[in-house]
Amino acid sequence: MSEVSKISTLLAPEKFVKLSVSDKFKWKAPSRVCSIVQSDTISMTANGRSLFTFDVLKDVLKHAEEYTYVDVLGVVLSGQWLLPKGTPGSAEIILLDSRLKGKASVLAVFNCRAATQEFQFLISPGYSLTCADALKKPFEISCNVIDLPVKDGFTPLSVEIACLVQFSNCVITRSLTMKLKENPATRTFSAEEVDELLGSMTTLRSIEGLRKKKEPNDVVQGHLSAEYDVKRSVKRTKSENTPGKRRVNVDSVSLGLGKGKSVSAKNEDTESVFDDGILDSDS
């Protein structure tokens, strides 16, 4: 698979934001603001399935107060297996929008083999939500390990999430066709395959049970990595030109050692499963 790329490169706003003719004549105030938000590193341990909330607005609350809508332009999931190359087993990582019920809440399912050591995915959710809804922290990540020969108490995997969000006072029509130039071995699955990978509704019922038990500290914080104003062009704000070193907190996420057959044991080392009708993946 391809090497892991820089977040600032994958989520460069000019790849996602389409400027209108009226935008190019605006001089005084930006019509939109784009922010790259990166999570703390999540260290996975082997103690059963866990569910965490990803707070995308922690460092950009001022924009949530100034604007009406937040647009999720792109999401990058990066992972590093902390194991020898060739170790058997895999991880199932599910991204969810908890505002929705059942299968509709699944934005993407990633199955990543431990043998690959590192993985990275770029997806374009392609929809907006109100800032009021975003403040309720609807985005979640569920993790589970399958057939990994690791003892309890050790950390086999670290994961980081980053997203490009755009704030505006209107729902913007834009192009969301940008994909990774170096494709990290992805393919589109049929609805039947998605159902099989999710264990029909068993996995979703398990996640719903975790929501009821979730503690207030089960939140993966997002930190502002870069910010851009959309005027006549997409321009990085001066205050973010030379950002300081980002503080990284390590949150512990529990992962179970499942006994079921590894669903990623196919031809490709790393696979991306997209919910039918929600996301599209190009090879």
From Swiss-Prot:
Compositionally biased spans, kind Acidic residues: 270-283
Keyword flag Cell membrane: no
Primary subcellular site in the record, as a coarse category: host cell
Domain of life: Viruses
Subcellular location, record wording: Host cytoplasm, Host cytoskeleton; Host cell junction, Host plasmodesma
Matching InterPro entries: TMV_movement, Viral_movement
Pfam families: MP
One biological process term in Gene Ontology: transport of virus in host, cell to cell
Name recorded for this polypeptide: Movement protein
Keywords, ordered alphabetically: Host cell junction, Host cytoplasm, Host cytoskeleton, RNA-binding, Transport, Viral movement protein
GO terms, molecular function: RNA binding
Family affiliation: Belongs to the tobamovirus movement protein family.
Region called Disordered, residue ranges: 233-283
Underlying gene: MP
Function noted in UniProt: Transports viral genome to neighboring plant cells directly through plasmosdesmata, without any budding. The movement protein allows efficient cell to cell propagation, by bypassing the host cell wall barrier. Forms a ribonucleoprotein complex with viral RNA. Binds microtubules and modulates microtubule stability. Can bind double-stranded DNA.
Entry's Gene Ontology cellular component terms: host cell cytoplasm; host cell plasmodesma; host cytoskeleton
Native source species: Sunn-hemp mosaic virus (SHMV)
Record has Chaperone as a keyword: no
